[in-house]
């Protein structure tokens, strides 16, 4: 079974757990201020991207992963949480797949969903946050971009105040991130990740040698593109890049979803690795 196939198999198992989280029907119904609308009152997602008072593109808003799999019971468990192909395998669509080091290939073959830090209630770190089916609220100021995730009340900080990226930051799940503007694109550099991270449900790795670059651009009101580049010689034979798309979500708010409250699903996940191989 290929890494992509394993990713999709594990995706189905993870989705079963995710469906225990608050569903869309339970999300709040609050109108979002400042949303451009068509004459019939619907959000105009193709309207120009907003700008901040200090002349920068405004990335603020509620976002979630695009490129969602069809709800056919095979590629995706049917439910209200929209699962993307890249959640199962970040290299989906990359010709030839990701350039794994052999130990990563071995891990993908040997490990299962119960080994994924995400299924053990550990908040997904760094770029994996972009692929989650849960909603993320981006809050942008001149000196800081904060990404709030409704899953486990987690957050990520991206410093925009001109500070350099530390040479050897303490390893964390989210790493240490700094950003600067190049025209209408926010360029984010990050490092300082833990060695035991997964980038997707297949088990693609991110280690302490990783240097991650995210080029974030809001192409219109409704679409955010993130060109993600990973240079991690411990896990990959060469650098690689993918594009992650985010869709804006309006007229709602985040709902608290604490993983430990769904720990009744863990016994099923513990039995899943042998079935997923």
Regions found by a protein language model. Give the residues of each.
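Bacterial N-terminal signal peptides
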Residues: 10-22
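A general, composition-driven signal for non-globular sequence regions
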Residues: 4, 16, 30-31
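PEST-like low-complexity, intrinsically disordered acidic/proline/serine-rich tracts
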Residues: 21-277
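Bacterial N-terminal signal peptides that target proteins for export
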Residues: 1-13
